[in-house]
């Protein structure tokens, strides 16, 4: 792309992905797996819909005084919270529940991952996460997800049937030798 090198925050994508996954889990009354893990498409979706921030704005492990994130305690708090919301009787009349659970979920995410900035200054210029992503020239739509599975036709798109592909994104299926060649 020729626009320089960047160090973007993985945790910005993680924060937004966890919130989306929690909402999908609540909406489906727990029929989507809410757990650690994700897919390639989560990153592309996150960039397209939420943007990018420099790593310095939301570094990994910052809430623990570490250089890497540790999700074990986070999961022991977050997973039962989301499960409890999915079992709430309010959801029988409203697929998204009340707005209050989202505030509580954001509080958990902020406590364990950090708060996502709405604006930030990078090299003297103010950005939003969306304007930051746009300034890089990176277009998530220019990328495809590749896979190699024998139970689907080759050279066609299909949905990878794994619990971490909760967004039901598609992958282009290649024979294994061609898949390895393009890797």
PLM regions with names:
Residues 1-183:
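Catalytic-core signature of thiol
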